[in-house]
Each structure stands twice: as C-alpha cells, then as structure tokens.
Swiss-Prot record:
The keyword Signal does not apply. Transmembrane segments: none annotated. This is Peptide chain release factor 1. Belongs to the prokaryotic/mitochondrial release factor family.
Length: 362
C-alpha cells in the first residue's frame, strides 16, 4: 500500500483514540449536539480501524507464507505453495476494501434529496412510465426506511405524471440515488396498442441534494417573482377555497418551482424555496465540474434528457445500464423497488474510478 495512505491511516487511528477519550468526558456528554457528532465520527473511525487491523493480519499472514517458501523442510515449502494464492487474494481484498474506505467522501452523500421525474418523448405512454418510475423509487425508499413526500405534480391525462417532484428523506439518501440522474428509456407495448407493436418512450430523472439552510446560496428577493394559485387534485373541498399553492420564478435563470402539497401557503413557499435552492446549487456544481474538464467518466448524471443512461425493455424483461455495460434480466423485481442490483454496481464502478485516479495522482 502507498506510504502516504499508511500515514493517513495511522493519523485516523490516533483520532479514533482521541474521540474515544472525548466521549468519556462529562462536558462532552452534557452537550448533546457535540456528543452525537462525535458518536457518528467514532462509528466511522471504528470501521476503518477494524479494516486496518484485518489488513495488517492479512499482510502478516502473506509475509509468513512467503518466508515458509524459503524453509529447508520440503513439506513446509509445499504447504506454503498451496496456501500462497489464498493468502495473496485475501491480502489484495483487504487492501482494496481499506482503500475504498479512505476515498474522499462526497459530503452531500448523507443529505436528503429532491427527486424530479419528467415525461419526455412518447406522450401518454411517457407519462405512464414516469408514474412507474416514481412507484419504483417509492418502493425502493420504503425498503431503505426512507420517507417520500410529493412536493408538486402534474398528472398525465391517462395516468402517471407529466412531472412529479418529491422529497426523499433518510440515511445516505443522495449517496444511493445520485446515479439515477439522466434519460430513462422504456420499450414496451402500450395498453392502448391494438396491433401489439413495441413503442419507445422516455423520461428524465434529476436527483438534487437538499442544501442545508446554513449552506444555501443567497437568493436576492428582488430576483423572485412569486405567484399564488389554487391547488388542484386530491384534497377535498379545501383545495378550491384558498390560493395556497405557490409558484416561484427565479428571474436571472428562468427557473420555475411550484408547490401545492401543503394547505398552508407559508409551508408551500418554504418547500418551493428549498427546491429552488437545490436547483441553483446543482447548476453551480455542474459549472464547477465543467470548468475542471475532468477526463474521468462522470457516472453521476446531470439529469440532461440527451444523456440516456438506462433502457427498460419489457418484452425481454431486460434492464440495460449503458454507463457500465450492465444487463439484468429481472426487470419485474427492479420495477418493484429491488434497485440495489443496479445501484450497488454503479457505486462499485464509481469507487474503482476514484481508486484509479488516486493511483495516478500518487
């Protein structure tokens, strides 16, 4: 392993001991916010310390096996020859696992996020597919113990959504969903198709990390146009009584955000401002990425409709993830929320790219 990584690990072990001592101090225990923050840090460091111990054990085992190859005893040499492949494989596995844990973490990975799904080419069928995608993500969120709440939606004429924006809250939400941004294409026979022909439709998905209030981009109130209107859709008689829905237009960029989820105009405005802040921050982050002109693949999509990332082929029960050449014939399970079989390989590929970049820089 690279000496600089070993030094970094030794520093983390020292920090682990330091945090452990701090957690036993009365003044830390009295400060709940500080105590919770240190507890989280300790848990993360504990995993790294444990992984480092396993790495050292594998390293010692490999060294001992290699030394046995130099023994005079023929039986010992033969035994070492048999054990060497497993010892090397275990060492390499532990080394890679440890390196992955040391990769720079995106601080936004632990944030909640906004999930935006828009119907593209394909008319009614695209709107129906947008509804299917929203259901898929909702089922996945349920499996993860996350909470999903709709911020705004525009229903399709024959089901589904022309557009739906939802907030997803829970642990490590953005870190799991950030690879979903981009163009999603579906190939299937619509229910209204009498000839049995396969149609192709498309939707775009954008996943935006929620920006904590303290980090939000400062928005000049004079650059906002705020309209109120009556909410539509489910909600009983109340929806026709008050202009509780909010539409905010950010004049410099032309970004428009609507929210009609809450009965309170004040709450709708707060939600809309939060979505607007997330979109402005995402646009700023995209500008930074473009300025860096990175030669590495960017597996975290931008939500651009021209960036087709995935195809859902219903006649073949096939899902194709184009960014990593992954093909799975379990579309039914995936549409029911079993998304880890797609998301986990994406994360692994992303980490492999990061490791390659780290090796180049060292």
């Amino acid at each position: 392993m690279n000496p600089s990584l070993i030094r970094k690990l030794e520093g983390l072990i020292e920090r682990h001991e330091e945090v452990q001592a701090m957690l036993g101090e009365p003044d830390v225990a009295a400060d709940q916010d500080r105590y919770r923050a240190l507890t989280r840090e300790y848990a993360q460091l504990e995993d790294i310390v444990h992984a480092f111990q396993q790495f050292r054990q594998a390293e010692e085992n490999l060294d001992a096996t290699r030394q046995m190859l130099e023994e005079d005893d023929a039986d010992l040499r033969e035994m070492a020859q048999e054990e060497l492949p497993l010892a090397k494989a275990t060492f390499e596995e532990q080394e890679q696992a440890l390196q992955v844990m040391l990769l720079p973490r995106d601080p936004k990975d632990d944030n909640n996020c906004y999930l935006e799904i828009r119907a593209g080419a394909g008319g009614d069928e695209a709107a129906i597919f947008a509804g299917d995608l929203f259901r898929m993500y909702s089922r996945y969120a349920e499996r993860q113990g996350w909470r999903v709440s709709i911020v705004s939606c525009n229903d399709g004429e024959h089901g589904g959504y022309k557009e739906v924006i939802a907030k997803v809250e829970g642990e490590h939400v953005y870190g799991r969903l950030k690879f979903e941004s981009g163009g999603h294409r579906v190939q299937r026979v619509p229910e209204t198709e009498s000839q049995g022909r396969v149609h192709t439709s498309a939707c775009t998905v954008a996943v935006l990390p929620e920006v904590p209030e303290a980090e939000q981009i400062e928005i000049n109130p004079s650059e906002l146009k705020i309209d109120t209107f009556r909410a539509s859709g489910a909600g009983g008689q109340h929806v026709n009584k008050t202009d509780s829905a909010i539409r905010i237009t950010h004049l410099p960029t032309g970004l428009v955000v609507e929210c009609q989820d809450e009965r309170s105009q004040h709450k709708n405005r707060a939600k809309a401002m939060s979505v607007l802040s997330a979109r402005l921050q995402a646009a700023e982050d995209e500008r930074h990425r473009a300025a860096e002109q990175s030669t590495r693949r960017n597996l975290v999509g931008s939500g651009d409709r021209s960036e087709r990332i995935r195809t859902y082929n219903y006649p073949q029960g096939r899902l194709s993830e184009h960014r990593i050449n992954l093909t799975l014939y379990r579309l039914g399970e995936i549409m029911e929320g079993d998304l880890d079989c797609v998301i986990s390989p994406m994360i692994q590929e992303y980490q492999a790219d990061q490791l390659a970049s780290l090796a180049e820089s060292n």
